[in-house]
Swiss-Prot record:
GO terms under cellular component: ribonucleoprotein complex; ribosome
Pfam families, per the entry: Ribosomal_L9_C, Ribosomal_L9_N
Family: Belongs to the bacterial ribosomal protein bL9 family.
Species in which this protein is naturally found: Helicobacter acinonychis (strain Sheeba)
GO terms (BP aspect): translation
Membrane-spanning residues: none
InterPro entries documented for this protein: Ribosomal_bL9 (IPR000244), Ribosomal_bL9/RNase_H1_N (IPR009027), Ribosomal_bL9_bac/chp (IPR020594), Ribosomal_bL9_C (IPR020069), Ribosomal_bL9_C_sf (IPR036791), Ribosomal_bL9_N (IPR020070), Ribosomal_bL9_N_sf (IPR036935)
UniProt function note: Binds to the 23S rRNA.
Protein's UniProt name: Large ribosomal subunit protein bL9
Keyword Chloroplast assigned: no
GO molecular function, one term: rRNA binding
Top-level taxon: Bacteria
Record keywords: Ribonucleoprotein, Ribosomal protein, RNA-binding, rRNA-binding
């Protein structure tokens, strides 16, 4: 019997492959445990269409993330904070504060605080480059200008 593997099966094949197996193994193990489907033309064509649609969706999402990374490069946030006599801030600028400011000034950039990478806490005035992990290995960078009030 021919089956279309829905997931990787050790010593048999990878997901998406059509394999020839014995009837008992196919029916009692692979199909029963939803690791494979009976390989008819309809099932194979449907699987290929799903894979193609998934690839198109991933390509579209990656293009959107690249566009967001380009947009982020043009962003410079200015944050006003109280400063002590030695030039250091009272407290540090947090990821949460950065995401709130981004949402205020750039509503189209929808980022979560866990996406922001701070190499070290921001505790003094100056210009800092902030990295944002957008997924799919894409990293965006924008600048923050910390100014004394």
């Amino acid at each position: 019997m021919k089956v279309l593997l829905l997931e990787d099966v050790k010593n048999l094949g990878k997901a998406g492959e059509v394999c020839e197996v014995k009837d008992g193994y196919g029916n009692n193990f692979l199909i029963a445990n939803k690791k494979a489907k009976l390989a008819t033309n309809e099932v194979i064509n449907k699987y290929k269409a799903e894979v193609k649609k998934k690839a198109e969706t991933e390509a579209l999402e990656k293009a959107q993330k690249l566009q967001m990374a380009e947009t982020l490069q043009t962003v410079t946030l200015t944050i006003h904070k109280k400063v002590g006599a030695n030039g250091s801030l009272f407290g540090a600028i947090t990821k949460e504060e950065i995401t709130e400011r981004l949402k205020e000034h750039h509503a189209n950039l929808n980022l979560d605080k866990k996406d922001i990478e701070l190499k070290h806490p921001i505790k003094s005035t100056g210009i800092y480059e902030i990295e944002v992990k957008l997924g799919s290995g894409i990293v965006g960078v924008f600048k923050i200008d910390v100014v004394a009030e």
